[in-house]
């Protein structure tokens, strides 16, 4: 920045005029344009000289100002500098070079120089060329900085879009939350799978993908549900219920089965059967809700064991169909909908709430068979209030024999009462039973 000197004081960054020994008016060629040096130090002395501009590197000059020297008459008396001459202001990003400023108490007198006008013109032209070269370098530096800034900005945007975690997908983000989830739950087993934070662990990815889909890919909601499900498993220990607990045969015998069938496409269809018409004493079966829930959880674990998730070798496609699901069949033959016992409602409500939390996205389709015609309208009316995804999974059937037409890829293997040619349902898998009045753990 230029300092404001006294009227009798020469200003910095203004080239001195070149004069003959005698007071003579020297006119510079009007066609000559001299560009002001970017950073020039003018030293004040008794004999004023114009120094070559020092090499100064600036990153981004705001502007380049050229100034034509005006003809002036120099006398032997002190030179008077026109205060109206504009002083170019140069702003750079680098620290400004220090300019030696004249003392406020000293007046500067320009003395005649012996240089010829042509020599001065050559020197000025040399200064001009040096300035042009410096300007070109500065422009190149500016372009490089702009390109670098653009590259940095693009990288930042890409990083934000990537959600700042792994590859940016909801599943990848869910993986990054898994260590904290396991620590919060103080448990790491889900459906026979020991959860592993490594993204290459196929079985863990299946579990996480199911919890994500149950929450519309909302990671915080899926995280909260997974923590709750892990805590529930830690307390309930459903695998031990399947392996070690003998349930009361009087209460739960013939109430639930699991079957597996090879499909015509080369896969496997797992079906869980709930035969509510087999209940002999409603109050005994449903009045103890915690006991009923344990029995139902053990049957569900048996179904998952048939799915064999722990040995799966392929992940669920991110936006593709889930091959790791089962079919459920609820048979209401001989069940009265008009005289529904409150204990049945309580047990059903608790089961629905618990299973939706602890076993998300394991249901492929659910068939309600042998539903009385008089109650068929209820399921039709439900379609008005249920989501499209839920409606696709629920199928009320008035007759059990119609089930085979709903599952054509395994129809012939189904029991005869369900439209197939297979063996009796009692030949299917079930939980352990005791002959006593209460369930007991072996």
Curated annotation (Swiss-Prot):
Pfam families: CRAL_TRIO, CRAL_TRIO_N. Residues 1-10, 58-92, 101-117 have a biased composition (Polar residues). InterPro entries: CRAL-TRIO_dom, CRAL-TRIO_dom_sf, CRAL/TRIO_N_dom, CRAL/TRIO_N_dom_sf, Sfh5. Its cofactor is heme b. It is found in: Cytoplasm; Endoplasmic reticulum membrane; Microsome membrane. Signal peptide: none annotated. GO terms for biological process: Golgi to plasma membrane protein transport; regulation of exocytosis. SUPFAM superfamilies: CRAL/TRIO domain (SSF52087), CRAL/TRIO N-terminal domain (SSF46938). It catalyses: a 1,2-diacyl-sn-glycero-3-phospho-(1D-myo-inositol)(in) = a 1,2-diacyl-sn-glycero-3-phospho-(1D-myo-inositol)(out). Keywords: Cytoplasm, Endoplasmic reticulum, Heme, Iron, Lipid transport, Membrane, Metal-binding, Microsome, Transport. One of its GO terms (cellular component) is plasma membrane. Heme binds at residues 276, 296, 330, 332, 366. Residues 1-119, 141-170 are annotated as: Disordered. SMART domains: SEC14. It is a peripheral membrane protein. Non-classical phosphatidylinositol (PtdIns) transfer protein (PITP), which exhibits PtdIns-binding/transfer activity in the absence of detectable PtdCho-binding/transfer activity. Regulates PtdIns(4,5)P2 homeostasis at the plasma membrane. Heme-binding protein that may play a role in organic oxidant-induced stress responses. Belongs to the SFH5 family. This is Phosphatidylinositol transfer protein sfh5. It comes from Botryotinia fuckeliana (strain B05.10) (Noble rot fungus). The gene is sfh5.
């Amino acid at each position: 920045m230029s300092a404001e000197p006294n009227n009798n004081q020469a200003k910095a960054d203004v080239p001195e005029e070149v004069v003959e020994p005698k007071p003579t008016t020297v006119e510079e060629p009007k066609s000559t344009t001299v560009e002001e040096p970017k950073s020039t130090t003018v030293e004040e002395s008794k004999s004023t000289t114009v120094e070559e501009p020092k090499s100064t590197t600036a990153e981004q000059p705001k502007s380049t100002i050229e100034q034509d020297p005006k003809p002036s008459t120099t006398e032997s008396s002190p030179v008077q500098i026109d205060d109206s001459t504009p002083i170019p202001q140069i702003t750079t990003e680098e620290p400004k070079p220090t300019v030696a400023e004249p003392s406020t108490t000293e007046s500067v007198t320009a003395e005649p120089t012996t240089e010829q006008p042509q020599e001065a013109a050559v020197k000025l032209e040399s200064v001009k060329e040096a300035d042009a070269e410096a300007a070109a370098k500065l422009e190149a530096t500016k372009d490089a900085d702009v390109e670098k800034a653009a590259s940095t900005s693009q990288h930042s945007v890409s990083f934000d879009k990537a959600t700042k975690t792994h590859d940016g997908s909801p599943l990848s983000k869910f993986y990054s939350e898994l260590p904290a989830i396991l620590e919060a739950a103080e448990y790491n087993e889900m459906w026979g799978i020991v959860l592993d934070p490594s993204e290459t662990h196929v079985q863990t990815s299946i579990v996480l993908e199911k919890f994500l889909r149950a929450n519309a890919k909302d990671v915080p909601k899926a995280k909260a549900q997974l923590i709750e499900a892990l805590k529930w498993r830690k307390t309930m220990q459903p695998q031990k219920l399947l392996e070690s607990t003998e349930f009361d045969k009087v209460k739960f015998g013939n109430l639930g089965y699991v079957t597996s069938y090879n499909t015509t496409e080369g896969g496997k269809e797992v079906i869980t059967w709930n035969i509510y018409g087999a209940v002999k004493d409603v109050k005994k079966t449903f009045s103890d809700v915690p006991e009923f829930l344990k029995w139902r959880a053990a049957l569900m674990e048996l179904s998952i064991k048939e799915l064999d998730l722990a040995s799966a070798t392929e992940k669920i496609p991110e936006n593709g169909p889930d091959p790791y699901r089962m079919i459920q069949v609820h048979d209401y033959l001989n069940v009265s909908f008009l005289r529904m016992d409150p204990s049945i409602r309580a047990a059903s409500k608790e089961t629905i709430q618990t299973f939706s939390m602890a076993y998300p996205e394991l249901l492929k389709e659910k068939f309600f068979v042998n539903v009385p015609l008089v109650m068929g309208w209820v399921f039709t009316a439900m379609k008005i209030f249920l989501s499209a995804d839920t409606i696709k999974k629920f199928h009320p059937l008035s007759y059990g024999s119609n089930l085979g037409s709903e599952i054509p890829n395994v129809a012939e293997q189904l029991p005869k009462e369900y439209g197939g040619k297979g063996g009796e349902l009692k030949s299917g898998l079930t939980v352990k039973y005791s002959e006593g009045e209460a369930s007991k753990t072996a």
